[in-house]
Amino acid sequence: MSAAKENPCRKFQANIFNKSKCQNCFKPRESHLLNDEDLTQAKPIYGGWLLLAPDGTDFDNPVHRSRKWQRRFFILYEHGLLRYALDEMPTTLPQGTINMNQCTDVVDGEARTGQKFSLCILTPDKEHFIRAETKEIISGWLEMLMVYPRTNKQNQKKKRKVEPPTPQEPGPAKMAVTSSSGGSSGSSSSSSSSSIPSAEKVPTTKSTLWQEEMRAKDQPDGTSLSPVQSPSQSQPPAACTPRETGLDSKEDENILSGDRVDGGRKVRVESGYFSLEKAKQDLRAEEQLPPLLSPPSPSTPHSRRSQVIEKFEALDIEKAEHMETNMLILTTPSSDTRQGRSERRAIPRKRDFASETPTAPLSDACPLSPHRRAKSLDRRSTESSMTPDLLNFKKGWLTKQYEDGQWKKHWFVLADQSLRYYRDSVAEEAADLDGEINLSTCYDVTEYPVQRNYGFQIHTKEGEFTLSAMTSGIRRNWIQTIMKHVLPTSAPDVTSSLPEGKNKSTSFDTCLRPSEKQEAEPGEPDPEQKKSRARERRREGRSKTFDWAEFRPIQQALAQERASTVGSSDSGDPGCLEAEPGELERERARRREERRKRFGMLDTNDGPGMEDTALRMDIDRSPGLLGTPDLKTQNVHVEIEQRWHQVETTPLREEKQVPIAPLHLSLEDRSERLSTHELTSLLEKELEQSQKEASDLLEQNRLLQDQLRVALGREQSAREGYVLQATCERGFAAMEETHQKKIEDLQRQHQRELEKLREEKDRLLAEETAATISAIEAMKNAHREEMERELEKSQRSQISSINSDIEALRRQYLEELQSVQRELEVLSEQYSQKCLENAHLAQALEAERQALRQCQRENQELNAHNQELNNRLAAEITRLRTLLTREGGGESTGLPLTQGKDAYELEVLLRVKESEIQYLKQEISSLKDELQTALRDKKYASDKYKDIYTELSIAKAKADCDISRLKEQLKAATEALGEKSPEGTTVSGYDIMKSKSNPDFLKKDRSCVTRQLRNIRSKSVIEQVSWDN
């Protein structure tokens, strides 16, 4: 019991009688796989890249529909958890988990999301929206995920009432899921008698290949076991023959032997999908497993789990250069032997193979254990068609050259039949495609020298695409990958249309140089060569030029015939050489010496070269064949007939066309356009050379005639030495006369033929000249058209660049104009404020002036009042003095006390008056000071007004200059663009009549001045009242 607690059951396996209990420990499912370590040991059964809607997205809200979906790598595990992470590495922590055991339904999400190929996973907690790029991928995911809601619904119906509801149900690892290329899928039933309808068939998707490979490798017998079918629907499958078992064993041995290349190295996964392939060709079969009760093998689950874990760890410990090694592996129809991708799987697979082979059934009657059945529930049925080689799926940074010669860096992704390129890897995740290269018509990938980096060209029927890589290794890797991708299906058979005599080592080099074309054998050129030549001429600006190679087969045939004829004539007759070798050598030496002497001379009598050469050959043979004089005469007639036949059958254009062939070849080799004068001079040189050859042949004819006479005489004397000399002389004279007549006839005929040949030569020369001129004209026209196209193209590009520059300048000028207008408005506003302040200052100055005038008036009034008081005081003093003098005489003794009192009062009154006068003087002086202060303020305000006015005038003048300058620039830009200059460009300025006044300021000034005046007046009135009192 303690051992059981220390070693709990680490893997849940559904009991065949109660699906919610484990068949090993009979504990509920929730007690298994509780921590992350257990979750990492779970077996993944499906995976791939999908797009996930962000959390909190409400697709009923139109604003949320424009949210960007997140690209994540989803992995569905056997325990029913659907996890998604940022990449496909098993060590990456998942960003979220969807518990498919609680899923209620998986429905199409296009109606809600507005996105194609989207699904909605409904759970009690929330809704999850996923989306794929293609219909095949989303169909495969729908097929896998639909198993869970069906299973959950059926388990809820079939549950026993005494059992408490469990939060998790058996995952799809316990269901039979067919491959997406042709198998059918369904959900497992709680009892063996029920079945679920199989899902819709979908084609193979990239995200399922790695899972199908693991299923194929887990089954050495090559079959997939599916419990979907009911006993009534299932049919007995074909028995596994020893031959099939041996084939699978051989294939596994190939994998085990070929997977020890790179152990312990880490590779970056080049593809967005798991780059795991099938190790062998699958066979379509489905088997129904009856419920068996035999105990399972305890070692098999651990080996299966360790195998899956090491398969996923293999993705994390491969190296980047491993992709290059995989490009060189050859694929066969029976197996896909792959090296390097599964080297870490070699030892676990050997252990797994050893543990499973004894239990593999060989016939339908072989019993299987319940553990075997449980293990078979998570396998998919295999397919018979070969899956695409995922090693060809490659991505990386390359630089592409565009038509204008500019290079731009892109993120390239190699897909099925296309090479797509994006702005970067983020754009690839968002499916933001920049362009695509169709590889279905690609027939070659070659290295191409470029100025920077390492370039290569992809040759397709649509054209050539120039790319470049950072290093030569990366370039070689890409070339091998693309070639391996396109060669098995679309590589053209270059050697099929070439002549047998041509060198077979030249493949994909169809554009021969002119010197190489001259050596090639005549025949119909390869269509690919024609296209390549056309492309070469198009690149060189000669797409419509005349092809001189059309004349070459006839010229080559004539040259070969002439060479063979001359060779045969030089060889001579063997009998003659044996008879008289020394004399023949001397004759030939003499002829060569005479020919060298006459080489520079021009003879008027021209003769056909081929006829004279053949005549010389036959005449050299004739001395050894003649016998009697009758035979000699007959032989002469026969030779004459033969010479006539030879003249009639000799092609007349041989002399004309053979010399012209070098002209054509030289024209094509140099690719120069000769003028008519140069062509005529060349033809004249060729004619002189032909005339020299004709004169040489005539001279050789005369020599041969002399030799013939000498030989005939020597032969006659040798054979008929005893014949009378007269008879010999008569016969010889008759024969010589006849022969001479024939020779004269032949010469006359030869002269007539020579005249005809000259006329024909002149006519053909004229025709060739006209043809050459027409060809040169065609070349000139083609070159002119090409130049016009290039010029038009360059003009268009220049105009577009100029338009863009002008548009940019116009935008810049408009922005500057707007900024100047804004500055002018600010200055105008400041000017308005200054003007308003000046107005306020002027009003304040005017108020000060009025107050000053009022003060002056009051001062005058006070002066008058003071003068009046002084006058009154003087009068009063005078009156008192007179009174005192008058009363002093009469009442000096009687009223001394009264007089003293009156004098004191008067003295006090006088002092008061003097103090009042003093106060008034002080007030007058203070008023004078205030007046001076007011005058100073006025002067300061006027100076400030002048400074502000001057500053504003300068600013306005500067703003006017800037506006006029910008108007001129804008006018020049609009004239350059061909538009009408803007009229009525208004600039807001300051209007003194429109400026708002500030009444509060005036009121404040007025109230201040009035308050001061009021204080002064009140003070003077109080003093006056006190003085009166």
Curated annotation (Swiss-Prot):
Write out the ranges of the annotated region (Disordered).
152-267, 279-306, 333-383, 490-614
Query: Residue ranges of the PH domain?
Result: 43-150, 391-487
> Does Coiled coil appear among the keywords?
yes
Q: Which residues carry this modification: Phosphothreonine?
A: 300, 650
Using the UniProt annotation, give all residue ranges assigned to the region (Interaction with RHOA).
550-828
What residue spans carry the Polar residues bias annotation? 492-509, 562-571
Feature: compositional bias, Basic and acidic residues: 245-267, 338-354, 527-550, 583-592
Q: Does the keyword Coiled coil apply?
A: yes
Q: Which UniProt keywords apply?
A: Actin-binding, Coiled coil, Cytoplasm, Cytoskeleton, Phosphoprotein, Repeat
Q: Name one GO biological process term.
A: maintenance of protein location in cell
Phosphoserine modification, residue list? 198, 224, 226, 230, 232, 271, 275, 294, 297, 369, 497, 622, 804, 981, 997, 1018, 1020
This entry's Gene Ontology molecular function terms read: actin filament binding
Report the leader peptide range: none
Compartments it resides in: Cytoplasm, Cytoskeleton
Q: Where is the composition biased (Low complexity)?
A: 179-195, 226-237
Region: Interaction with PPP1R12A, residue numbers:
828-883
Q: What CDD domains does the entry give? A: PH_M-RIP, PH_RIP
What Gene Ontology cellular component terms go with this record? actin cytoskeleton; cytoplasm; stress fiber
Q: Return the InterPro entries for the record.
A: Actin_Cytoskeleton_Reg, M-RIP_PH, PH-like_dom_sf, PH_domain
What segment(s) does the record annotate as region Interaction with F-actin? 1-387
Q: Which residues does UniProt call coiled coil?
A: 675-979
Record-linked SMART domains: PH (SM00233)
The record, for Pfam families, names: PH
The role this protein plays is: Targets myosin phosphatase to the actin cytoskeleton. Required for the regulation of the actin cytoskeleton by RhoA and ROCK1. Depletion leads to an increased number of stress fibers in smooth muscle cells through stabilization of actin fibers by phosphorylated myosin. Overexpression of MRIP as well as its F-actin-binding region leads to disassembly of stress fibers in neuronal cells.
Name recorded for this polypeptide? Myosin phosphatase Rho-interacting protein
